[in-house]
């Protein structure tokens, strides 16, 4: 959002002002890049009702960010996060699993960094190979291996549980369904319209298996669904 021309940003925000004034809307949320954040601009959009800013961090590993050509670094994520928090705005940090040069260990480190940076919200997206992209070329040449559905579900379930334990709200798991991916655009990767439900099912399956394998026969557990 903050990468748009300032006039366009303001025009969008001005449309909402009457609704804010009447308490019909309590705040505005936007998503943007870490390298498109400045203290001055955050102050300005806060004045116009911005209450939540999500940053598309994707990873906090500089090697992963470089090879994915994200155009920002871990330091950019840290600086942008600090600016947002300094203005009392709720911080969200989005992450993506299965990126080139990524690993489950690096994914979990990204999750730890998201918690430590003070984010209160996150989104977990799996990396998908889309037609006519550089990632497709890497995939076709055997230089990139996409995550399977099962692997992505397993990783996402661990990340979700970690975020919940650390009071970080997970706003979404999995990509939005789109006509492009449903038709010719999809090449490879863990894309499924019910991806989030698969993750939650995996989490509950593990919880029940842990109960089943408990050493104490008289162990009583309350499970709230």
Where are these regions (language model features)?
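Conserved non-cysteine loop/helix-boundary elements of the Radical SAM core domain that shape
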Residues: 1-121, 131-150
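Short glycine-enriched loops at secondary-structure junctions
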Residues: 125-130, 176
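Auxiliary Fe-S-binding modules of radical SAM enzymes
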Residues: 133-134, 140-225
């Amino acid at each position: 959002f903050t990468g748009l021309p300032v006039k366009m940003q303001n025009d969008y925000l001005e449309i909402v002002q009457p609704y804010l004034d009447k308490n019909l809307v309590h705040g505005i949320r936007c998503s943007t890049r870490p390298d498109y954040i400045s203290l001055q601009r955050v102050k300005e959009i806060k004045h116009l009702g911005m209450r939540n800013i999500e940053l598309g961090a994707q990873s906090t590993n500089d090697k992963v960010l470089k090879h994915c050509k994200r155009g920002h670094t871990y330091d950019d994520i840290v600086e942008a996060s600090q600016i947002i928090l300094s203005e009392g705005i709720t911080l969200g940090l989005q992450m993506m699993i299965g990126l080139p040069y990524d690993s489950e260990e690096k994914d979990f480190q990204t999750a730890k960094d998201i918690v430590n940076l003070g984010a209160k919200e996150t989104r977990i997206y799996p990396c998908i190979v889309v037609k006519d992209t550089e990632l497709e070329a890497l995939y076709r040449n055997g230089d990139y291996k996409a995550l399977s559905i099962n692997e992505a579900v397993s990783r996402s379930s661990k990340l979700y549980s970690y975020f919940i334990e650390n009071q970080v709200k997970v706003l979404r798991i999995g990509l939005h369904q789109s006509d492009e991916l449903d038709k010719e655009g999809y090449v490879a990767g863990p894309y499924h319209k019910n991806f989030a439900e698969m993750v939650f099912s995996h989490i509950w399956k593990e919880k029940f298996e842990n109960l089943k394998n408990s050493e104490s026969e008289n162990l009583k557990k309350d499970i709230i669904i």
